[in-house]
Amino acid sequence: MLAGGRLRWWQWRGRDCAVQSQMVVDAHVHLHPERLAEAIRRWFDAHAWHIKYRAGVDDAVRTLREGGVARMVALPYVHKPGLARALNDFTLDVSRRNPEVVPCCTVFPGEEGGEEILEEALSGPFRGVKIHSHVMKIAPDDSRLDPVWRASGRWRKPVVIHCGPEPANPGYGLDTRTVSGADRLRRALDRHPDAIVIVPHLGFDETPQFEAMLAEYPNLYLDTTMVVGAFFARQPDVDILRRHPDRILYGTDFPNIPYEWDHELKALRTLKLPPRDEEQILSGNALRLFGPDAQ
């Protein structure tokens, strides 16, 4: 038992967790206010897939908690200026109601007061920053992101940036390859070598290019979100998990997914990684990167 009578991750009586014997941290979840969440669901319904989990934030947290997930890293993101501060406040409130939630902040690059928003958030309880190149229509090496990279290096907190080209979905209203790619991130990191960066989805479909960067940029990491469970017709070489277990985090995109919450967890388990490697991917790397609030 934990302080206050809360159960440890393996003691919940919900659905069996795909990995019952070790701590699981989902390093990629989205917990948005209902109005924004509904708009996101409509977008996915029109352009991608039908989201399976459509209840509110607290129900989403409960689903993961009762399944055995010990911590979940909340990654808010905005599509236009003027929304970040309120969304950050919402995310922090969710984390205060649900101690399993590790709050990250967001900012719209270049917006008025953006640097102040970052400083307020990262000097406080927020454990990282979420940027989405497709949604925000901004490439990693765009100068408007320089304050984000600087803040990451200064506060030693990661930036989770979706900057792999896929999904190249016309619903974004642009050619995603114009704002993404390993080379664009490389240019940003050459300017800001102290920034800590997590690229979701193993950087698909430029996974080999992002993997090649791991040796050169020690602060670069990848996550597994939606690319180890064979949902898409194409997926990256999952043996990357064997080659770099210390640089990859487990994540899901929950609740914005078309299948059971543990679909990818079970797929990862079937890889039969060495126990130490599996532990690093499922929790160790996330605990190290997101700091004491994730412990």
Predicted regions and their residues:
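Mid-to-C-terminal alpha-helical segments outside catalytic/metal-binding sites
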Residues: 2-30, 36-71, 244-249, 258-295
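Active-site neighborhood of phospho(di)ester-bond hydrolases with catalytic His/Asp-centered motifs
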Residues: 24-27, 75, 104-105, 130, ...
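Active-site environment of divalent metal-dependent phosphoester hydrolases
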Residues: 32-35, 79-82, 110-113, 165-169, ...
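Short aromatic-enriched loop/helix-cap "lid" or pocket-rim segments at secondary-structure transitions
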Residues: 35-40, 85-87, 117, 171-174, ...
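A general structural detector for well-ordered alpha-helical segments in enzyme core domains, enriched
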Residues: 59-63, 87-94, 117-121, 144-148, ...
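A structural motif corresponding to the C-terminal end of an alpha-helix
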Residues: 66-70, 98-100, 188-196
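Active-site gating/metal-coordination segments in enzymes
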Residues: 70-71, 79-168, 220
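Catalytic pocket-lining loop regions of alpha/beta-barrel enzymes
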Residues: 127-128, 142-249
